[in-house]
Design a protein with these regions (language model features):
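C-terminal transmembrane-bundle signature of multipass membrane proteins
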Residues: 160-232
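A generic, lipid-embedded transmembrane alpha helix
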Residues: 48-66
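Membrane-proximal helix-loop-helix units in multi-pass membrane proteins
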Residues: 95-162
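Alpha-helical transmembrane segments in multipass membrane proteins, preferentially the mid-helix core
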Residues: 27-34, 90-96, 141-178
Length: 232
């Protein structure tokens, strides 16, 4: 059926498609950081840094189609470290989106710094092993990775996106923009799509599509915020 054809297409085209995804992530990174330099809005800086981290993530996966050996291993190690260090920025994005007061923002940033430290530690502690799929060599977390690092990794994946969805609903109701909600919801939906369809070997690829949806929604939020500021 259609699912089988789609899977075959992804496996055949994977090595090329990940380069396209990396380029799209780079484009949104530039758009977000340029908007930040114009408007100096801290939420845009957080969004731009997450987009930058996701671009690096996609770039290293893309390089897995042409690179092997110690260089790819070192780049992959930094992929885990940057993911652990930057994804917690979703917490301040929630706080800025809700227009939280200074005491709440201070608390959120202290909490974020602690989660970042745990995320970076998790990135260095993760035991890497080779995985090959669709012409791409990737370093992934091995079964020998310490249990605490696995737990931190899982919390970073889901414990950051769920608050984004909840805060996104509140922002949607108050400000009438679904962009923050959709950024979290689409990321969560794509993360679940791989396991739900039984394509466990393609979870990384399907999640990359979710990441693009997330940074697209970040960009749309930035556009909305700019227009709102221009009207007031």
């Amino acid at each position: 059926g259609g699912a089988v054809i789609m899977r075959a297409f992804i496996l055949e085209s994977c090595a090329a498609l990940v380069w396209v995804m990396a380029a799209i992530n780079l484009a949104f990174t530039v758009l977000l950081l340029r908007r930040y330099t114009r408007e100096r809005s801290p939420i845009l800086l957080c969004m731009g840094l997450i987009a930058l981290g996701l671009f690096y993530d996609a770039l290293v996966i893309s390089l897995g189609g042409v690179l092997e050996g110690p260089l790819l291993a070192a780049l992959s190690r930094m992929r885990f470290v940057s993911h652990g260090g930057l994804i917690p920025l979703l917490f301040p994005i929630c706080a800025y989106g809700l227009r939280a007061g200074k005491p709440v923002l201070t608390g959120v940033w202290i909490f974020t710094a602690l989660v970042m430290a745990a995320g970076v530690a998790e990135g260095f502690a993760t035991v890497l092993e080779l995985s090959r799929v669709g012409g791409i060599t990737r370093y992934v977390s091995a079964e020998t990775t310490p249990a605490w690092a696995e737990t931190v990794g899982s919390l970073l994946s889901y414990g950051t996106v769920v608050p984004l969805i909840v805060c996104g609903v509140a922002v949607w109701i108050r400000d009438r923009t679904p962009t923050l909600f959709l950024s979290g919801f689409l990321m969560f939906a794509f993360s679940a799509l791989g396991p739900a369809t039984g394509n466990f070997d393609l979870i990384f690829f399907i999640s990359m599509a979710g990441e693009i949806c997330m940074v697209l929604c970040f960009h749309l939020y930035g556009v909305w915020a700019s227009r709102k500021a221009a009207r007031t």
